[in-house]
């Protein structure tokens, strides 16, 4: 549950940031800040190491260590998006309250992008699921890969409208509207490339119609142009 005060919301969001699938050198699919022991495994399985070895003497856990299923994070985001608006009027700083909503949309888009680029279409959940005694009601079918990228774009458009344009509102290292634009440009470039160079399979669960490639490239281009217009960033 959320503590509906500034510190409570900040704590809630901090946990979501901590779990973001940021693919740096200390990230595994299971989480951020992998331990020193685990960190040594990454070069071993990526081809970076000069020599690699395997001491896997058991099949227990096979196929699970590298899984990327962000639905725990997505549930926490959906819980926030569903419940926070009822308390939003309690905060005098409406800019900050909007920024928190923008962060939630940004984080959800980030998680979905991490999954869709690995698996193609995945189930889209807009609200937290509740177990009511029937497990079948929780089994949501996969959406198409196109639907997932469109959902990511939708979330990032909302994030762009709600997030501040500087770090002073939320704090250093947290999302701004420009982070939303940057992520959108990257995600839409992926979508356009999948459409142009990939093939559609499984009734659209994997792949995007080639005719839509330029539409996604245009979305990526417009996001970059909006970033350029801010005059806050440059290539180096």
Predicted features and spans:
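Short, small-residue-rich loop/turn micro-motifs
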Residues: 126-130, 156, 189-193
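Short, small-residue-biased leader/transition segments that mark boundaries at the very start
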Residues: 2-4
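TPR/Sel1-like alpha-solenoid repeat signature
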Residues: 105, 181-187
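Aromatic- and acidic-residue-enriched carbohydrate-binding clefts of CAZyme catalytic domains
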Residues: 129-140, 209
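Short coil/turn linking the two alpha-helices of tandem helical-hairpin repeats
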Residues: 116-117, 123, 190-199
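Conserved, well-structured interaction surfaces
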Residues: 7-14, 18-28, 43-119, 135-150, ...
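Short, surface-exposed recognition loops and adjoining beta-strand edges that mediate ligand/DNA contacts
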Residues: 27-43, 125-128, 164-182, 195-236
């Amino acid at each position: 549950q959320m503590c509906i005060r500034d510190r409570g919301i900040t704590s809630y969001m901090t946990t979501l940031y901590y779990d973001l699938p940021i693919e740096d050198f200390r990230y595994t699919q299971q989480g951020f800040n992998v331990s020193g022991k685990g960190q040594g495994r990454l070069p071993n399985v990526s081809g970076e190491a000069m020599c690699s070895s395997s001491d896997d003497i058991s099949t227990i856990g096979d196929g699970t260590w590298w899984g990327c299923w962000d639905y725990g994070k997505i549930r926490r985001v959906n819980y926030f998006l569903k419940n926070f608006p009822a308390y939003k009027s309690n905060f005098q700083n409406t800019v900050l309250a909007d920024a928190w909503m923008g962060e939630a949309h940004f984080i959800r888009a980030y998680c979905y992008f991490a999954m869709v680029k690995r698996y193609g279409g995945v189930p889209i959940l807009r609200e937290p699921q509740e177990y009511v005694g029937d497990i079948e009601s929780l089994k949501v079918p996969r959406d198409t890969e196109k639907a997932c990228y469109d959902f990511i774009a939708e979330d990032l458009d909302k994030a762009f409208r709600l997030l501040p344009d500087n770090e002073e509102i939320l704090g250093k290292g947290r999302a701004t509207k420009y982070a939303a634009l940057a992520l959108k440009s990257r995600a839409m470039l992926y979508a356009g490339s999948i459409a142009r160079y990939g093939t559609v399979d499984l009734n659209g669960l994997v792949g995007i119609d080639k005719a839509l490639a330029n539409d996604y490239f245009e979305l990526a281009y417009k996001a970059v142009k909006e970033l350029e217009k801010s005059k806050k960033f440059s290539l180096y």
